């Protein structure tokens, strides 16, 4: 299995800066998306730190272990990298008054062979398109999701709820954070979408489905998704990562050959 990956981020129509951050390492199948929060550009700092830090640590580990790593090993490495990133952001936030309280959501995927390991914190999401069916693989860590789970609000009312952007878990806000990790089997033709809530707050699932099913390259689909969010108001930064699973064999990199992997 090989993966084609593309990314796109846009500030939207109402924000002066972009507090979303994306980091991808195509050689190891690592995709990271973070949506920062905090005043005075602190959200931009938090998301940028998360994306850069996790990419640096996780991509290095993946390059060394390669396809020989088990799902359990990938899960543990992901958890450690996120723990380290959380500590780094939390320390920075408490060392600089300008950054106090900053944090970020996180959704990341490690695409290896016929499996993907997903990690997420907050309300940035991962969807899978298999055939003509779109499935949300991650569950938001948010007050609204808790209300939905408890039956306190209907799905229809949730679309206009004032609690829709209140996350219950974020990277860098507290000294310890728990990343939710899940593994899924990948099939040839699967398409994966990692996105910030700037997309999902503006674009309905049925419209995302239509775009994912439409003709064109991944880059075309990413551009259409961002345009749809802006057409519906673009009230937040919009970021997407698209990954397409294709039949093929990954060529070993230089480091893997040196390590005899």
Annotate each PLM feature.
Residues 1-261:
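PP2C/PPM-type serine/threonine phosphatase catalytic domain
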